[in-house]
Amino acid sequence: MPISQAFTRQHRLLTGPQYQTVFDQPEWKVGLGGYLLLVTRNSQPHPRLGLVIGRKRVKRAVDRARIKRRVREQFRCRQQELAGLDIILLVRGRIENPNPNQVTLDITRLFDKLLAKCRQA
């Protein structure tokens, strides 16, 4: 039976302490453009994702939602490769009028860099 690629509640960082653990002790930091991934190992068989995309960094709600959708899609498609990791995506630079294709490309490259770093460790 194939493994589900759904993005369920168990695949999200939900509470402040869960986020704080990743912020306080990231094992890996992977950055690209205005994005940064903070990653640490978790004790669960599946990965968990948290998103921090502030209004100061990405002004329009539609753009914030678009970035979140693209990140969740990449995460959902790569769950098996990311098993056992807690991941937070931060937007650290100001992103004005992001091109949807460029956002997808940046997020794909970011996850590729993360997987390469995980394989080295």
UniProtKB/Swiss-Prot annotation:
Catalytic activity: Endonucleolytic cleavage of RNA, removing 5'-extranucleotides from tRNA precursor
GO molecular function, one term: ribonuclease P activity
InterPro entries assigned: Ribosomal_Su5_D2-typ_SF, Ribsml_uS5_D2-typ_fold_subgr, RNase_P
Enzyme class: hydrolase
A Gene Ontology biological process term: tRNA 5'-leader removal
Swiss-Prot/TrEMBL keywords: Endonuclease, Hydrolase, Nuclease, RNA-binding, tRNA processing
E.C. numbers: 3.1.26.5
Domain of life according to the entry: Bacteria
GO cellular component: ribonuclease P complex
Pfam families found in the cross-reference section: Ribonuclease_P (PF00825)
Any coiled-coil regions, as ranges: none
Quaternary assembly: Consists of a catalytic RNA component (M1 or rnpB) and a protein subunit.
Family statement: Belongs to the RnpA family.
Function noted in UniProt: RNaseP catalyzes the removal of the 5'-leader sequence from pre-tRNA to produce the mature 5'-terminus. It can also cleave other RNA substrates such as 4.5S RNA. The protein component plays an auxiliary but essential role in vivo by binding to the 5'-leader sequence and broadening the substrate specificity of the ribozyme.
Matches recorded under PANTHER family: RIBONUCLEASE P PROTEIN COMPONENT
Protein name as it appears in the record: Ribonuclease P protein component
